[in-house]
């Protein structure tokens, strides 16, 4: 569900094993702005992997931040009417120690997406873009009757 007319539908719960920083461990009352404001929560959402799904008349697009994965760590498949995106990398050292990450996302494709024309690309900044054009059904404008069950 969209959060507003200007913000498309997004999944904000994709942290992919981000490390904790010092201010993540501070109690709520340590904020100088307000005892009820916790900056790190909002910051974490903005800097985490975000999935965005867009569907308009012309195309269906999925954009997924996979910056922690190399192309060899990713798998994208179409199975029936679903696109499945899987990412997994073995244990690596980062700023906070050692970490391994794995995720699995499954999205339903609209029935009018041309599956034979789907493309998938990975940008240099780690944004995976999956896109497919929609086909228009051949409808006779003079005959618009449709039974409703």
Swiss-Prot record:
The keyword rRNA processing does not apply. Pfam families: Crystallin, HSP20. GO terms for biological process: lens development in camera-type eye; negative regulation of apoptotic process; protein refolding; response to heat. Residues 41-149 form the sHSP domain. Zn(2+) 2 binds at residue 96. Signal peptide: none annotated. It comes from the Eukaryota. Transmembrane segments: none annotated. The keyword S-adenosyl-L-methionine does not apply. It is found in: Cytoplasm; Nucleus. PROSITE patterns: SHSP (PS01031). GO terms for molecular function: metal ion binding; structural constituent of eye lens; unfolded protein binding. Keywords: Cytoplasm, Eye lens protein, Metal-binding, Nucleus, Zinc. Zn(2+) 1 binds at residues 89, 91. Zn(2+) 3 binds at residue 143. GO terms for cellular component: cytoplasm; nucleus. Heteropolymer composed of three CRYAA and one CRYAB subunits. Inter-subunit bridging via zinc ions enhances stability, which is crucial as there is no protein turn over in the lens. Can also form homodimers and homotetramers (dimers of dimers) which serve as the building blocks of homooligomers. Within homooligomers, the zinc-binding motif is created from residues of 3 different molecules. His-89 and Glu-91 from one molecule are ligands of the zinc ion, and His-96 and His-143 residues from additional molecules complete the site with tetrahedral coordination geometry. PANTHER family: ALPHA-CRYSTALLIN A CHAIN, HEAT SHOCK PROTEIN HSP-12.2-RELATED. Contributes to the transparency and refractive index of the lens. May act as a chaperone, preventing aggregation of various proteins under a wide range of stress conditions. Belongs to the small heat shock protein (HSP20) family. This is Alpha-crystallin A chain. The gene is CRYAA.
């Amino acid at each position: 569900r969209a959060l507003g007319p200007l913000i498309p539908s997004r999944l904000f719960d994709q942290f992919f094993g981000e490390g904790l920083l010092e201010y993540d461990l501070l109690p709520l009352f340590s904020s100088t702005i307000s005892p009820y404001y916790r900056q790190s929560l909002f910051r974490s959402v903005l800097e985490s992997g975000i999935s965005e799904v867009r569907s308009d008349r012309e195309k269906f697009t999925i954009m997924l931040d996979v910056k922690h994965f190399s192309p060899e760590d990713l798998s994208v498949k179409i199975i029936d009417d679903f696109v499945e995106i899987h990412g997994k990398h073995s244990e690596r050292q980062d700023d906070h120690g050692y970490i391994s990450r794995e995720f699995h996302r499954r999205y339903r494709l609209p029935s009018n997406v041309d599956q034979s024309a789907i493309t998938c690309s990975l940008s240099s900044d780690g944004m995976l873009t999956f896109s497919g054009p929609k086909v228009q059904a051949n409808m006779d404008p003079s005959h618009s009757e449709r039974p409703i069950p």
